[in-house]
Amino acid sequence: MSDFRIDQITNRVGDAGTQICGVSTFSGRSGMIIPGGSTEFRGGRGRGVFLAGYAAPSYYTSMDYVEISTTGNASDFGDLSVDKNYSGGCASATRGFSIGGWDEPGGTLLSGIEYVTISSKGGTYDWGDMWESAYNVTGFSNSTRGLCAAGYGGPTSPLGPYMNVIQYFQMATTGNMSDFGDLVHTRRQHGSNGSSTTRGFVAGGQYDGSGAASYVNMIDMITMTTLGNAISFGDITADCDGANSASDATRLVISLGAGPSPLDYGLNIINYLTMATQGNASDFGDSTSKYTSSPGTSNSVRAVFGGGRDNPGYHNTIDYVTIATTGDATDFGDLTSQRVVNAAAGDAHGGLGS
């Protein structure tokens, strides 16, 4: 065996690499790391996947994806296993999850958890089941745990139609969710929410404690690394349902949804808060148009929000903002169809750390 030094490897023209065959050894001043693991887990991160959705009377299994660091229209990713709406979404650095939901047109409350490999394209795979079946749940995660909170279980649910339950699972191992604790405020709130590596948030939602549905502005905070109940963190700037958020490691950006009665699908308000500091959210700017239920995901720089509904139409718009600044959203591109997206999942969000 002999040693040799290589500073650069090209073909004869100098515009491409060459192949090295057989058994070879290399030395270098900065070292070399050989890729390991399955090829589906290699490559750069920063992809966001929008999980199905609906535009009544049609319901979709289709998923779209974007590369968050660029701009442009979304591309087809694959399909969920069932037509459903009002599911929650969360993600690890490799997998995106769709949690629960409502089966259309079957009219069935769903407990299943499906997952995709974010760096690839294709269909979903079965992961396990929720601890308690629900739709209108909201999802969030750090690098190890996926959680969902709130929800609507229907009149036969042992936890009541509107739920305050928090559920969790380990994202590295297939299996069912377990009970985590309770929210401070009972409500339903579907979609996806941002997080830090330790804290998850549920902002806004719809509550029926008085016998008549009302929209709320409360923010609950959950410490994801432990088990236990949420605490009250503060308020967003308006009562709303259908709010979604995304984050870097320190700041949460919240796209507000539908306003209170008379039903207003026209809240184009974006809020933000510093996740380490308890308190109320502040105004960030405006979305490019007025709509509700536009799930978001992020990388370390940008948050993107896709789809949504106004009254009476549906949107395929994707907005983005730079998380560390304030200001109005900018047009990113379009989804492949106009719809309310169930949830979103990304492999570089703030809850994953670096």
Residue ranges and their predicted role:
Residues 2-354:
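Polar, enzyme-active/binding microenvironments
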